[in-house]
Curated annotation (Swiss-Prot):
This is Histone-binding protein RBBP4-A. It is found in: Nucleus; Chromosome, Telomere. It comes from Xenopus laevis (African clawed frog). One of its GO terms (biological process) is chromatin remodeling. Gene3D superfamilies: YVTN repeat-like/Quinoprotein amine dehydrogenase. The keyword Disulfide bond does not apply. GO terms for cellular component: CAF-1 complex; chromosome, telomeric region; ESC/E(Z) complex; nucleus; NuRD complex.
């Protein structure tokens, strides 16, 4: 009986999701300046824009690259680098041109060939997360279903994977007992990599000190303050010795690598009422960070007074798994998760007055809801070179590259507000 009910619930949910998607699609020309939808061969659990951009002469597009991974059933997995063509601002755009088969608009010339897989490197098991080293973007670290963290220099691998299916990372980083997701390169100390694991620990490696012949590197330090699965870890963006971690023990911890005590953080906060899944430091304001949780909220913190939560962002209907500050705007951050939505928030709008109708759509700081995914969003990344462009990937193989309409974030004209999800009120 329960099985029948579950099947019925699933069917109803699927119908609702399809209905919502149709409404979203109908409204895309009003809500976006760009939407590209691409079905990957396998879902990617990870997405990160690389820092480089190519602007070919005489073309109305620029070429950007993404680090992705695969999560296959039983087939060979790969670390993937893809290229994406994005239209220049002056490209002739016709938002009414929406190819419903391809699911793309904001097209320029032909809409084909905008997203191409350039490099595939054989990987052991799915790629839980992949992040490039800021000082040398050819170096990419990955989290695997085993306890090892792998490091690849993609310039030392052929762009087509070895048919033998052998995974040959340039380094294997040892120290964990279990898998995990959190991974962070130090932006100020080249080669310093942090990793968070289900084994309740955080490992730190320094790969810049590795002898040329050694392929296996042991952790330099292991931090053991959390009492449950550590979900995410992130270096502070300005202070080379500070980092933050969040875990299923509902805590946010701030650590200093100069301290000799690896089992006690310099600060520990009961951050949420459920597991804390992600954190992000603000790139413009050295004291500000955000955490995202299974309690469906994003919390805002000030390192100078962690006892007091600055704000709680509430609109998600399920667990939040990723939070990222915009690289271009100090007050903008985005969050995503199980509810298939990516919310963009604007701190500067906290506390603004709202009409009762507007309040029904969400709090004033909720700038935009990206409703284009029909499955859980695994990861997303702000494009570092094109303001307001985001790439998001979901569990149903879909990757979307999109940019909200300029009139949404340039709100000189505040008359006639748009429901952020374009679903009417």
């Amino acid at each position: 009986m329960a099985d029948k009910e579950a099947a019925f619930d699933d069917a109803v949910e699927e119908r609702v999701i399809n209905e919502e998607y149709k409404i979203w699609k109908k409204n895309t020309p009003f809500l976006y300046d760009l939407v590209m939808t691409h079905a990957l061969e396998w879902p990617s659990l990870t997405a990160q824009w690389l820092s480089d951009v190519t602007r070919p002469d005489g073309k109305d597009f620029s070429i950007h690259r993404l680090v992705l991974g695969t999560h296959t059933s039983d087939e060979q997995n790969h670390l993937v680098i893809a290229s994406v063509q994005l239209p220049n601002d002056d490209a002739q755009f016709d938002a009414s041109h929406y190819d419903s088969e391809k699911g793309e608009f904001g097209g320029f010339g032909s809409v084909s060939g905008k997203i191409e897989i350039e490099i595939k490197i054989t990987h052991d098991g799915e790629v839980n997360r992949a992040r490039y080293m800021p000082q040398n973007p050819c170096i990419i670290a990955t989290k695997t279903p085993t306890s090892d963290v792998l490091v690849f220099d993609y310039t030392k691998h052929p762009s087509k994977p070895d048919p033998s299916g052998e995974c040959n990372p340039n380094l294997r980083l040892r120290g964990h007992q279990k898998e995990g997701y959190g991974l962070s390169w130090n932006p100020n100390l080249s080669g310093n990599l942090l990793s968070a694991s289900d084994d309740h620990t955080i490992c730190l490696w320094d790969i810049s000190a590795v002898p040329k012949e050694g392929k296996v590197v042991d952790a330099k330090t292991i931090f053991t303050g959390h009492t449950a699965v550590v979900e995410d870890v992130s270096w502070h963006l300005l202070h080379e010795s500070l980092f933050g971690s969040v875990a299923d023990d509902q805590k946010l911890m701030i650590w200093d690598t100069r301290s000799n005590n690896t089992s006690k953080p310099s600060h520990s906060v009961d951050a949420h009422t459920a597991e804390v899944n992600c954190l992000s430091f603000n790139p413009y304001s050295e004291f500000i960070l955000a955490t995202g949780s299974a309690d469906k909220t994003v919390a805002l913190w000030d390192l100078r007074n962690l006892k007091l939560k600055l704000h709680s962002f509430e609109s998600h209907k399920d667990e939040i798994f990723q939070v990222q500050w915009s690289p271009h705007n100090e007050t903008i951050l985005a969050s995503s998760g199980t509810d298939r939505r990516l919310n963009v928030w604007d701190l500067s709008k906290i506390g603004e007055e709202q009409s009762p109708e507007d309040a029904e759509d969400g709090p004033p700081e909720l700038l935009f809801i990206h409703g284009g995914h029909t499955a859980k969003i695994s990861d997303f990344s702000w494009n570092p070179n094109e303001p307001w462009v985001i790439c998001s990937v979901s569990e149903d193989n879909i990757m979307q590259v999109w940019q909200m309409a300029e009139n949404i974030y340039n709100d000189e004209d505040t008359e006639g507000g748009v429901d952020p999800e374009g679903q009417g009120s």
